[in-house]
Amino acid sequence: MSCPHHYPSLTAIICCYTKTHMSKTIWLRVALPETDLSALRKEFPRCEITTETDDAIGPAQLERIDGVFTEEALPDSLVEQMPNLRWLHVTRGGVSAYLTPEVKARSIQVTGSKGIHGAVFSEFALACILALVKKLPECLQAQEQRKWQKLVPVEIEGKTLGIIGLGTAGSELGRKAKALGMRVIATKRTATPKPDYVDELGTSDFLPHLLAESDFVVLLLASVPSTFNIIGENELRMMKRSAYLINLTGGRAIEEPLLIRALKEGWIAGAALDAFARQPLPEDSELWSLPNVIITPRIAGIPSQKWPAMLPIFRENLRRFTAGEPLRNLVDKELGY
């Protein structure tokens, strides 16, 4: 079996021949730079690489596909045309959006790029915290009005940071916050030994204590059913009135109307939001107009140089897939992570 040659575009098909000469067909549904595609050709000499777009791939090609590397979720209408699909690798660490009914129902292994977004998420969280306490939104508003307004910034040293979800990103944030002199407390899904940079660590039972103690609460959760509405009215009222909520990953962790009410009525001081139940956030959402809210368009986890971080995981999993070995970052499709 061979693949026709084309120049790289938005998608690519890789026909991989294993040592037993059994072919594997991998669809690269991502916009890889030419240099990276060339490197893949050299690393996998038995693979013929050709590029196709979604519209250009015909039924005969789809039937041969064994694996897909994608940035956007695969619609079930495409998955249904790939009877041999056995592996789906995605560019994100969180994979819930990719677990469509067809993907979940079939014997398709799903792997993600978990572990590479910690630095960018942690930096973004700190940027939000510092912007809020240093009154940058108020300064920008005053600048637009050409108004010389005296404000009183607050120091973060000695303040308590509560991290809900001490995974890769939460751990990176904890390390950085501790280096800045903050007290760090956190929750984790399962009980593990406490790392040195965390002052207190617990599981879900620890959440009320974390909310009551924290000056900043950062949500770094997988968007899965077990985390939906994890922050309700009782939890918001446990927080200090001077506390800030930063939500970077759990768009459905808190209901939007409830959060709006909490912000308008002063249950908490403010929020920075990069994750929403409705994305993009609709223009008619009241969140846009609240003065104590920073809204960003789902950019917290985007690295400026993503391929150097993502490709090593894909290349290793491609090697494992063609060799019949266990895949790295394999997702439990029932749990969603």
Predicted regions and their residues:
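An N-terminal-biased, well-structured beta-alpha scaffold segment characteristic
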Residues: 17, 21-111, 232
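Rossmann-like dinucleotide-binding domain for NAD(H)/NADP(H)
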Residues: 110, 242, 248-337
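Rossmann-like adenosine-cofactor binding region
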Residues: 191-286
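Glycine-rich Rossmann-fold phosphate-binding loop(s) that bind the pyrophosphate
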Residues: 166-167
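Glycine-rich, N-terminal phosphate-binding loop of Rossmann-like dinucleotide-binding domains
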Residues: 72, 92, 219-221, 248-249, ...
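NAD(P)-binding Rossmann-fold cofactor-contacting core
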Residues: 179-197
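Cysteine-centered motifs
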Residues: 3, 15-16
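Phosphate-binding beta-alpha-beta segment of Rossmann-like dinucleotide-binding domains, i.e.
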Residues: 105-160, 172, 179, 189
